[in-house]
Structures are given as C-alpha cells and as structure tokens.
Amino acid sequence: MKKYFLILMACLMFLFAACNKTASSENKAESNYPPMVKVNGTIYVDTGYENAMVTCGTADGQIKTTVDGRKMPSKDDESNFGKGYGYQIWEKGYINVQIDNRWILFRDLDLKDESREIPEWVAHFTGKVIKAESDSLMVEATQIDDRFYFKEIMTKPISLSIENLDNSKDGKVTTEDLEGKTVEVYFGGEIKNIEPENSDPIFLENIYRIIVK
C-alpha cells in the first residue's frame, strides 16, 4: 500500500510541475509587447533611451486611456503601460513620453529598426580612457556636442561601469589594453558628483553603451 501511495504522489508532483511549466510559458507568451503608445494615428514603441536634448518641459498631449500590456494600443492617446503620462512630438518618427520626470524616446513602429543604432538625442560624449580596472573604466571627456546641457559640468574624471562595454575577448567583456584608447559613451539618468570640490569622480547613473574607437 505504501508503495502505491509513493507512486501516486510522484505522479501528482510530475503533473503539477508540468502544469506550472505550461502556465509559465503561456504567461511569457502573453507578455510579448514592449511599452507602446498611439498618437495621431501612429503607434510608437519605447526605445529604452532618455532624450537629453529636451529643453522645454511643456507636453503636447497626454495619454488618456490604457490597455493590457499584452495588447497594442488601438486609439489615439492610448498606451499599453498606463495613463496620465505627458508626451511631446519630437523629430519625424519620434515622440518623447514623460516617465518618472524623464523624457523617454519612443520610435514609430513602422520605422526600420536599427537595433544597434542609438538616436542622436541620447546623451553621449567622446572620451579617453585614463585608467582601466577589471570592472570599471576611468575616462576624461574630450568632445561633447554643444547641444547637450552637461557639456560645462563634465570637467572631472568620469567613472564608468562596464556592463555595456562593447569590447570582448574569448566571449567575455574585458578592459584589457584600453588605457589610452578613445571611447564613445552613451548614457542616461542622473549625473552625480559634479561639484568641483568633490574629490570623487563623476558617476553616470545609466550606461547604455561604451564603444571603443
């Protein structure tokens, strides 16, 4: 009797695990759509990048309705990630949506997806690597576009994490031989430790990509 009971329990555990796996797969499949919004008949999709060239905080409109995240918005001023967010019409094919007090770039869904190309309005600068550690880089900014608000404050060394460094060896990200090299740094979020009297290096909140030139 005990033997049959153990067999029955094993079968039930197998079925439970199989059901959980199926449910997990279904939930994953249902969460396919990234954040999207429909404005003036066009659906825009979140690029994941912050627009650092916004100089006016006035919104052109507001997201008024929302649908489930598993759906695409079907009418104007509707999103699949919430309502109440302001938006600005930007350059052709792009709008900005104000999320957590930051203007996030959304791209026309019908535009060719250049997944490796970062929009020109995202904060970036050219720099020289002055020190390379195994998990970080120290750089000094050598060239910054005049249109960026932070040009006048990047006067100290800048510390960079390397999670998004485009430099690998044997399939692993590495900082080997990078001292003295030129890099292009794309970032977003807060710029910390900018005070001249602060001896700590400048710290960038979000590093989108570091490209070695």
Predicted regions and their residues:
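Short, low-complexity S/T/E/D/G/P-rich linear segments that nucleate or cap local secondary structure
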Residues: 10-13
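C-terminal motif of bacterial Sec signal peptides marking the signal peptidase cleavage site
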Residues: 15-18
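Short, flexible, surface-exposed loop segments at domain boundaries
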Residues: 25-28, 33, 81-84, 90-144, ...
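Mature extracytoplasmic domains of secretory-pathway proteins
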Residues: 29-91, 134-184
